[in-house]
Every structure is written in structure tokens, then in C-alpha cells.
């Protein structure tokens, strides 16, 4: 059984003991799907005799996999999240469920999936910037449901996202790159696309320059 901010596992077939561990301060475990993964790992760790402190320490040291809800930069209460591996709407739904006050960068080469699958999560989104081959179509599909602009490139979307946060005076927000599309319109693969986005942490001067305008 999974509860908010806690992992609680009932191992019915093995023991009557209810295992419980506090994960509220483990910020690298983002999203319910990662809590579920952690729950499975926790069961195995307890069965081989590891203590809660040892398990929690391992969770806290785990940085996650690249391009999967990867925190690449944090500026105060503004986070920059690389989810380039989310190449379909189903993967992106997990990202949207994991955050609030989202500036969402979306688009690439469409897999002909229905974007309306993501409509239930738009209340978490402040603004959408669409990019790539499918960008114009996505912007039209989202028009009237959320603030949205087609900006073509990932670089433009990044700059527009920073400007939007500044103009809107958002104190806490997430710039989420979760494209829900493949990368093949502009990049070799999702890894190359993710690495391009990850240049954010190497371009702090650009961020400060934009903020100073």
C-alpha cells in the first residue's frame, strides 16, 4: 500500500510485520511511480536484513537515471527538470502528476497519440511552450485549455520559460521539459536532446542575463 509521503508495505505472504519508512525528505524520489519503485526495493532490502537507516541512506544517494525527471539546475525555488526520455503521452503524464506550477516544454516528432490524455493534468500547468515538428499542431490542440505558445526550438522555449517566470513573478515553479514526442525531428535520440537541455547548468550566465533584462 502506498501512502503520501510514506512507504508502507504489507508483505502478506511473508510476514505480518508492516514495514514503514519516511521518505518526505528524499527529494530525488520524484513522483508516485518512483515511490512504487522504491517500495519494491525496500521490500527486498528488508528481507535481506538491512536497517531503515541504511535503506534511507541508499535512497538519498541515488541520483536517478539521466533524462528521467532529472533535476539539472535549481535557482532558488525554480527547478529545471529534464524528462527527455518521456517520448509519449503516458510517460509525460507521470511528470505532470509529479509537480505543480509547471512551465511545460512539449513537442518533437509526434507518435500520433492523443494529447487529450494529458488534459486532466493541465491545472498543474502555468504555461506551455511547444517545439519541433509537432509544435504548431500541439499548440492548436491546447489553445483555450491552457496558456500556450509555439516557439519552434528548445532553446527558444527555455528562454521564453525564464521570461514567463520573471514576468509572472512566480516565486516557486518548475520548468519541465517532458516532450511526449520522439526526438528525431531535431536530434539523433532522446539522449542527445536531453544533453542539450542539460546545458542549462553550464549557462548560468545566460539565465542571469535574461533575468537582468
Locate predicted features.
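Residue-level signal for inorganic ion chemistry
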Residues: 37, 41, 83, 104, ...
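Glycine-rich phosphate-binding loop signature in dinucleotide/nucleotide-binding domains
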Residues: 48, 98-99, 164-172
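Short amphipathic alpha-helix with an adjacent loop that forms part of the alpha/beta core around
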Residues: 119-120, 159-168
Amino acid at each position: 500500500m502506498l501512502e503520501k509521503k510514506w512507504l508502507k508495505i504489507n508483505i502478506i505472504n511473508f510476514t505480518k510485520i508492516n514495514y514503514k519508512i519516511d521518505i518526505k525528505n528524499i527529494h530525488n524520489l520524484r513522483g508516485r511511480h518512483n515511490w512504487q519503485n522504491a517500495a519494491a526495493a525496500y521490500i527486498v532490502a528488508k528481507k535481506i536484513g538491512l536497517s531503515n537507516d541504511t535503506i534511507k541512506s541508499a535512497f538519498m544517494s541515488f541520483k536517478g537515471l539521466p533524462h528521467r525527471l532529472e533535476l539539472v539546475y535549481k535557482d532558488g525555488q525554480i527547478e529545471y527538470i529534464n524528462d527527455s526520455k518521456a517520448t509519449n503521452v503516458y510517460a509525460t503524464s507521470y511528470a505532470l502528476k509529479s509537480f505543480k506550477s509547471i512551465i511545460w516544454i512539449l513537442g518533437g516528432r509526434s507518435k500520433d497519440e492523443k494529447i487529450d490524455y494529458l488534459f486532466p493534468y493541465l491545472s498543474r500547468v502555468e504555461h506551455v511552450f511547444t517545439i519541433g515538428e509537432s509544435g504548431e499542431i500541439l499548440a492548436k490542440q491546447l489553445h483555450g485549455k491552457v496558456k500556450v505558445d509555439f516557439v519552434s526550438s528548445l532553446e527558444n522555449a527555455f528562454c521564453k520559460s525564464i521570461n514567463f517566470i520573471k514576468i509572472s513573478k512566480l516565486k516557486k515553479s518548475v520548468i519541465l521539459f517532458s516532450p511526449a514526442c520522439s526526438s528525431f525531428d531535431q536530434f539523433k535520440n532522446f539522449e542527445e536532446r536531453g544533453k542539450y537541455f542539460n546545458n542549462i547548468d553550464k549557462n548560468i550566465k545566460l539565465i542571469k542575463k535574461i533575468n537582468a533584462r
